[in-house]
């Protein structure tokens, strides 16, 4: 009887010891996962024709969560603002441009919010015009396919269908009053999406690091070590020459210029930045960088 008690006691002690060892191993492994380190990922499959980079200091587990937020936000909005493709069970910009003259189209809250922001920015700057989709389509075709500028007649015809007042919003419904009117949100959609991603990451607990969305740099908070952020802005005259901007605060920088996307015809460069007043590429300045707190507004 005494011998059986001794065996039972040793079994209990052994089980307790194994539980203790397992707990220590689990704690050490998870402690390692919580170690803060500088992490970086570049996503090339989330749309907007550009790589999206996230850099921050956090644990591996949190970084996986933050990367998921970036991926989800950009992929969803790439579909939402896509003017070239339709998607199943979704009204997007393609749907709007092909059907909004025939009947009002029900759009989701995010699309309406971006559309209203674009209209607000247009009321403050007439050179920014989302209703110039027909004109931009001409230049997109020239840049991506023919490498020949569109004719003056085609440009004039497209100019006749630029009119923000012919876009009507009622609640979540959008309709067009011109069958040839077309919206293009390319000048604001990526910046707007980067701003949404920033807000989602901040809400999830990330308050340091940055998002780089091809010309759109969004600082998520102050640097972990307390020093200033240093952002290089490319010179339009040399790909390896940079102008440095330094700041400690969370802010957004958006740069666009005639050196980024263009084609050359008969020794003349035609950039992707089109003036909605003339119908031709703008040639006022080579490059512009806007610094502000809101990436969507900076993009516009």
Where are these regions (language model features)?
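Mature catalytic core of soluble alpha/beta enzymes
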Residues: 2-300
């Amino acid at each position: 009887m005494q011998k059986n008690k001794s065996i039972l006691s040793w079994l209990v002690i052994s089980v307790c010891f194994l539980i203790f060892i397992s707990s220590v191993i689990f704690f050490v492994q998870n402690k390692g996962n919580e170690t803060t380190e500088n992490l970086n990922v570049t996503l090339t499959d989330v749309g907007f024709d550009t790589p999206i980079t996230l850099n921050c200091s956090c644990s591996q587990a949190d970084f996986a969560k933050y990367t998921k937020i970036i991926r989800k936000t950009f992929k969803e909005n790439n579909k939402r603002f896509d003017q070239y493709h339709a998607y199943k069970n979704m009204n997007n910009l393609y749907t709007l441009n092909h059907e909004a003259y025939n009947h009002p189209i029900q759009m989701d809250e995010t699309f309406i919010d971006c559309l209203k922001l674009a209209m607000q920015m247009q009321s403050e700057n007439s050179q920014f015009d989302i209703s110039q989709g027909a004109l931009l389509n001409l230049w997109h075709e020239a840049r991506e396919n023919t490498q020949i500028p569109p004719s003056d007649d085609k440009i004039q015809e497209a100019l006749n269908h630029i009119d923000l007042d012919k876009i009507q919003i009622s609640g979540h419904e959008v309709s067009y009053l011109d069958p040839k009117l077309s919206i293009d949100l390319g000048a604001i959609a990526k910046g707007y999406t980067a701003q949404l991603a920033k807000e989602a990451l901040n809400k999830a607990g990330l308050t340091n690091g940055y998002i780089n969305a091809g010309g759109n740099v969004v600082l998520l908070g102050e640097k972990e070590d307390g020093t200033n952020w240093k952002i290089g802005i490319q010179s339009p005259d040399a790909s390896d020459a940079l102008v440095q901007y330094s700041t400690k605060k969370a802010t957004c920088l958006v740069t666009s210029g005639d050196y980024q996307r263009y084609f050359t015809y008969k020794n003349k460069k035609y950039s992707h930045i089109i003036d909605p007043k003339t119908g031709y590429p703008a040639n006022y300045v080579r490059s512009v960088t806007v610094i502000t707190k809101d990436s969507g507004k900076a993009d516009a």
